[in-house]
């Protein structure tokens, strides 16, 4: 293995079983590792198959969390300076918004023909 590896600039962490333990909590050791990483300029990004609205508050409240990868990688969000507020403002009552809409930096849609093929395959097993 080469000793001249480039420095780590971004770490994407899956939620269940990686960032969150079996109780849905972030352990003190994991919190400490994330704090050290962000202090060293590493961007730490939670990554999940869940939609943005299902990002657990314990994750959104982690210091240094600014971005989130959701929907199995189909969307990448800039949560701004108030990640928890951004997560909830996206789906909350407009009159109660605590922050501006998060910016969706990337959204990949499945081509219509691929969706039709997948649906046809699914119907074979109905």
Kindly give the residue locations of the regions a language model identified.
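Asp-based phosphoryl-transfer active-site loop
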Residues: 9-23
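Short, solvent-exposed loop/turn segments at secondary-structure boundaries
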Residues: 23-26, 106
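Active-site phosphate-binding/coordination module
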Residues: 30-126
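Mg2+-dependent phosphoryl-transfer enzymes with acidic/Ser/Thr/Gly-rich catalytic loops
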Residues: 2-10, 26-28
């Amino acid at each position: 293995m080469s000793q001249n590896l480039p420095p780590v600039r971004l770490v994407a962490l899956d939620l269940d079983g990686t960032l969150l333990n079996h109780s849905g909590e972030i352990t003190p050791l994991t919190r400490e590792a994330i704090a050290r990483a962000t202090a060293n300029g590493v961007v730490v990004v939670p990554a999940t198959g869940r939609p943005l609205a299902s990002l657990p508050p314990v994750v959104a409240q982690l210091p240094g969390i600014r971005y989130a990868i959701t929907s199995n990688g189909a969307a990448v969000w800039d949560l701004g300076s108030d990640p928890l507020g951004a997560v909830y403002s996206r789906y909350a009552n407009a009159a109660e918004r605590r922050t501006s809409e998060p910016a969706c930096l990337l959204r990949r849609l499945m081509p219509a023909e691929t969706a039709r093929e997948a649906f046809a395959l699914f119907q074979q097993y109905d």
